[in-house]
């Protein structure tokens, strides 16, 4: 594949990466911050997510209504989100709207007003968001389990923060964190589609200078100490729930680990699609669950393999036993060549289909820069996936699926449901 990616770093530290996609009349533009919830202190837990919300409330040049009208006029898709390791603001527009879209995004990121009244209103909105999570059993179990799995570590804290922390985010605290951490040195601008790299560099240089440049701080590599995952057995009883919700987890290769490709493929074999082992054993053959699967979350310095299932409380024991049986099967038997080739084909097809999307490409440019510090081409990723062998999957399974590292979380009307370490023996 011809790689049409260009990369420029301005004197103030801001990075601009573009990928020209011939034949398009659209551009996906993103401004990404090298900061997420894992960079926050306990007292500031949730502040990146809070800033993600509040930059929409107005800037020195635009009111919140101005932002909404301008976004609608551009006709594009506007999105913003916070993860553990980054915060992102993206917009997909026609190529003729690129300059206006960049001006809008840059204005929001560089010059937000943070008026006290707006902050107080958004605190209420985010607290309602927290309540919504508590009313969504699988998400609620995820937060409870995360806290137990990553104890006393930023990865174990909720991205949206807590009622106590969010309520403390006044103008001084919010503006201070924004000035220090949302500075140009911590920003990555990406664009994919019908985009001129030189034009975007000019736009970025014009928007992020003066005050924003003066406030720039050196990028810290401190993302907290590497986490030491626990192996909790967490059983939370909630009688009003109709379903029981189950999580089984274990450490997994990080986003930077050499085994990340083998780990991704092994997770797909176990629970990555409708042909996967878990889906077939639990849903298709026995009808025990509507939602069941497995996946891997990869952070910069750790990873987590997770099985999730929702089932009736009286079927939870059987679902747990079937899930553990599949992990034991990976450790004691070899994954077949046919299974490996199937998930390779699935992964490669997903990559190739994603190349048609400017949004997928712009997001990949940002994540690779922030997590890896370099461009990783689709060809390189495909080659690494194709090089994975059955022996690699067996080795990863034996290394990570161990009794002492396995963790479990369950939520629901769980009277009589008991799990001890011996039951989790692999």
Q: In which residue ranges do the predicted regions lie?
A:
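Short amphipathic alpha-helices in soluble, non-transmembrane regions
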Residues: 103-108, 201-208, 320-326, 423-425
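Non-catalytic beta-strand/loop surface segments
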Residues: 1-39, 60-99, 133-185, 210-257, ...
């Amino acid at each position: 594949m011809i790689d049409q990616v260009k990369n420029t770093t301005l004197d103030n530290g801001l990075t601009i990466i573009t990928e020209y996609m011939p034949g398009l009349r659209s551009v996906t533009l993103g401004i990404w911050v090298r900061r997420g919830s894992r960079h926050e202190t306990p007292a500031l837990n949730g502040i990146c997510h809070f800033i993600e919300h509040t930059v929409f409330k107005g800037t020195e040049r635009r009111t919140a209504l101005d932002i909404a009208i301008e976004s609608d006029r551009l006709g594009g898709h506007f999105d913003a989100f916070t993860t553990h390791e980054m915060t992102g603001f993206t917009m997909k527009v026609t190529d003729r709207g690129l300059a206006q879209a960049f001006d809008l995004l840059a204005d929001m990121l560089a010059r937000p007003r943070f008026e006290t009244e707006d902050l107080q209103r958004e605190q209420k909105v985010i607290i309602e968001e927290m309540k919504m999570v508590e009313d969504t059993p699988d998400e609620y179990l995820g937060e409870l389990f995360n806290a137990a799995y990553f104890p006393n570590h930023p990865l174990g804290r909720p991205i949206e923060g807590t009622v106590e922390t969010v309520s403390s985010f006044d103008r001084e605290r919010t503006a201070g964190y924004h000035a220090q951490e949302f500075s140009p040195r911590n920003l990555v601008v990406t664009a994919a589609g019908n985009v001129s790299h030189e034009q975007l560099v000019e736009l970025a240089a014009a928007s992020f200078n003066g005050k924003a440049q003066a406030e720039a701080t050196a990028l810290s590599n401190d993302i907290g100490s590497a986490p030491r995952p626990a192996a909790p057995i967490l059983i939370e009883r909630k009688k009003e729930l109709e379903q029981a919700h189950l999580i089984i987890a274990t450490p997994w290769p990080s986003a930077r680990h050499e085994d990340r490709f083998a780990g991704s493929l092994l997770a797909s074999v176990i629970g990555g699609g409708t042909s996967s082992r878990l889906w077939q054993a639990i849903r298709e053959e026995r009808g025990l669950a509507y939602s069941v699967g497995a996946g891997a979350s990869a952070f910069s310095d750790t990873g987590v393999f997770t099985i999730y299932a929702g089932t009736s409380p009286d079927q939870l024991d059987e679902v747990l036993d079937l899930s553990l049986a599949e992990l034991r099967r990976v450790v004691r038997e070899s994954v077949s060549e046919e299974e490996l080739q199937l998930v390779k084909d699935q992964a490669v097809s997903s990559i190739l289909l994603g190349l048609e999307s400017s949004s997928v490409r712009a997001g990949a440019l940002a994540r690779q820069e922030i997590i890896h510090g370099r461009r990783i081409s689709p060809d390189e990723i495909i080659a690494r996936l194709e090089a994975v062998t059955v022996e690699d999957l067996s080795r990863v399974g034996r290394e990570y699926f161990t009794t002492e590292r396995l963790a479990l979380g369950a939520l629901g009307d769980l009277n009589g449901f008991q799990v001890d370490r011996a039951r989790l023996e692999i």
